[in-house]
Amino acid sequence: MAGLNCGVSIALLGVLLLGAARLPRGAEAFEIALPRESNITVLIKLGTPTLLAKPCYIVISKRHITMLSIKSGERIVFTFSCQSPENHFVIEIQKNIDCMSGPCPFGEVQLQPSTSLLPTLNRTFIWDVKAHKSIGLELQFSIPRLRQIGPGESCPDGVTHSISGRIDATVVRIGTFCSNGTVSRIKMQEGVKMALHLPWFHPRNVSGFSIANRSSIKRLCIIESVFEGEGSATLMSANYPEGFPEDELMTWQFVVPAHLRASVSFLNFNLSNCERKEERVEYYIPGSTTNPEVFKLEDKQPGNMAGNFNLSLQGCDQDAQSPGILRLQFQVLVQHPQNESNKIYVVDLSNERAMSLTIEPRPVKQSRKFVPGCFVCLESRTCSSNLTLTSGSKHKISFLCDDLTRLWMNVEKTISCTDHRYCQRKSYSLQVPSDILHLPVELHDFSWKLLVPKDRLSLVLVPAQKLQQHTHEKPCNTSFSYLVASAIPSQDLYFGSFCPGGSIKQIQVKQNISVTLRTFAPSFQQEASRQGLTVSFIPYFKEEGVFTVTPDTKSKVYLRTPNWDRGLPSLTSVSWNISVPRDQVACLTFFKERSGVVCQTGRAFMIIQEQRTRAEEIFSLDEDVLPKPSFHHHSFWVNISNCSPTSGKQLDLLFSVTLTPRTVDLTVILIAAVGGGVLLLSALGLIICCVKKKKKKTNKGPAVGIYNDNINTEMPRQPKKFQKGRKDNDSHVYAVIEDTMVYGHLLQDSSGSFLQPEVDTYRPFQGTMGVCPPSPPTICSRAPTAKLATEEPPPRSPPESESEPYTFSHPNNGDVSSKDTDIPLLNTQEPMEPAE
């Protein structure tokens, strides 16, 4: 029995020497003993509240508590009232190190007590080191080094390092870090506070860092980041995302192999309100003759740097009333130099105006793998992932990128007119400059914003090659397209996407538009010769858009209304001027039976008008069915005018035009031949009769006149042949013969259409006569559908006075006042000239 008691005593002594002991989990008993003057405090407290129904307590001598504090020189034995205390409690072990009253314990830092002797709770080891301002402290981290994370981020293994510094009595957060990074050392002065957070299941039993003594660093801190190969690091200013301490200095030292290149890009930053000094970043770059190089935070940062370099952030004296905050988050990317980095490209924009060129990364899915960055460098030094070049200068750029297909270009140019008297009839070419085409980066968009004075001028686009409108039935298969849309902020109007190789000869638009050349394949470089638009400023017209279409006899033309996916905007009118060659017939086909539009206010109309005869059909789109396929022998208009539709019932129409050769009916030819033969025989018979009568007259002797003075020599009056008076009939009114009936062959245009000039009606000039679209009915009217209604031309001249014997005018439906028609045949008068 004595031997047994001796063994128990030895075992208990061993537990005390270790400082803490844990009994088997079944007993759930723990003992923690802290040596005297160790400056260690252990605190067990409730962690994040859980939804567990049954609470858990710390049990000491049958007392149930929720928090336990153990100080130096104390020994406590305790248990938990539950089987899973890690779900309820956390443990903090804090060691205070005072370097101001005695020597500092420099070297590797140990975990005390050992994690193997502590309860299986989430653990936080804290080292709080206080030192003089003149003493620098350096935290050295063993491999794997640290990686800084931002707010809301977490470490994959749950192990985090929280590091803080001190400015007088104020604690400053340097940052939160995970394992597997590039941060190897952090230097501070006036003290440091290091917290290591370990999850309850993690087996780690070493701190992973050491403390060294250094001279004063004369700044808040210095963070060293070491790159052994290609990689990237994201770093943040102190207190991020809150404000950087006022008038402080923080430095990052980067160790980069000489054969690699480093580039810096700012991901996020804010500036405070400075009273004195200026917030800035300073670089110490190897080989630079101007070290340190000073940049503003909004400047493009250096890139393509070889070897080690330093980056410092300098604050300022802030405004006491409105200080604002200074903060910075940036990324350093290290990679091998690329061949393109040694090649300089010249982009000459000195002759351009109101133009900007942006080179930027394509949108890609994020990957956890390291991907070498793509940078574009200005003058080989200022590098960033985005670079914007402006007009008026000549620029030299190079690329630091392993794959240039990861970049693309977007260009914007504004062509505006402020004085309509100067701009009218002026033309501008919309072409991509050759300097841009020669760059090794693919062009994505080239946008021209075309601006005109409101209600003064309109625009016309004429392509180098006729355009095809992109539709689902006939998509564009070229390497680029033109996207035409309104440039008025309050107007949602997209005319469509167009590519070369179609039948659209020109596009007229009423007001400001944006024309965007968008490429879809690298082959655009080979097809660049096909691109080219000419824009001209023309007199103002009220149509939102007019498309001039000259269909090809070999293919079907598909056309659709603007805003196909959203519907034609309210109260918008668009027209298509469709030319039909003389020897062709056009078939107009709509692809659905009804338009589907439901008008909230007003009416939606479609007008199909023959340009030669002015015959037109008017359809109410919100009531009528769309017309069935119709054939047109001459050029014609299609006009579509929208109402204010209800939500979800928008107006969108798709139609096609197909040309076929014109054929003549054999029956018509036979009838014409027979009729011609009859007329010829009748003419021959009439000629024979006239010849015979003439011969009879020549056989008679000369006539002898005898004077008789009892005979009245006055010519007798013409007896009345009309029972009505002059006022009762239109005998004095002659119908005017239309010019097109007499001079029709002189009024035909190149496409065979008749151009009928308008008379006695003033309209603003809208181009060549006959190119004006039909005017839609009043939007709020309820006019029924009119079929083939020939337009009556207005009178050609003012009405004549009633005293004139003859009047040339159009038929008048009004009453004609009665006048005497008895006029002596030998006393006739010449008609008077019409009054001007």
UniProtKB/Swiss-Prot annotation:
Mutagenesis / variant outcome for changing Y734F: Impaired association with SRC
Extracellular compartment residues: 30-667
Keywords tagged on the record? Cell membrane, Disulfide bond, Glycoprotein, Membrane, Phosphoprotein, Secreted, Signal, Transmembrane, Transmembrane helix
According to the UniProt record, one GO cellular component term is:
extracellular region
Where does the signal sequence lie? 1-29
Q: Where is this site: Cleavage?
A: R368, K369
Q: Which Pfam families match?
A: CDCP1_CUB_6 (PF23665), CUB_CDCP1_1 (PF23667), CUB_CDCP1_2 (PF23668), CUB_CDCP1_4th (PF25142)
Signal in keyword set = yes
Transmembrane stretches, by residue range? 668-688
Residue ranges, Cytoplasmic side: 689-836
- Oxidoreductase found in the keyword field: no
Sugar attachment sites: N39, N122, N180, N205, N270, N310, N386
Q: Which residues carry this modification: Phosphotyrosine?
A: Y734
Region entry Disordered: which residue ranges? 776-836
Q: Which residues form the CUB domain?
A: 417-544
Post-translational modification, briefly?
A: Phosphorylated on tyrosine by kinases of the SRC family such as SRC and YES as well as by the protein kinase C gamma/PRKCG. Dephosphorylated by phosphotyrosine phosphatases. Also phosphorylated by suramin, a heparin analog. Tyrosine phosphorylated in response to dissociation of integrin alpha-6 beta-4 from laminin-5. N-glycosylated.
User: Cystine bridges: which residues?
Assistant: C476-C499
- Give the protein's biological function: May be involved in cell adhesion and cell matrix association. May play a role in the regulation of anchorage versus migration or proliferation versus differentiation via its phosphorylation. May be a novel marker for leukemia diagnosis and for immature hematopoietic stem cell subsets. Belongs to the tetraspanin web involved in tumor progression and metastasis.
Oligomeric state and partners? Interacts with CDH2/N-cadherin, CDH3/P-cadherin, SDC1/syndecan-1, SDC4/syndecan-4 and the serine protease ST14/MT-SP1. Also interacts with SRC and PRKCG/protein kinase C gamma.
The protein in question is named: CUB domain-containing protein 1
Organism of this sequence: Homo sapiens
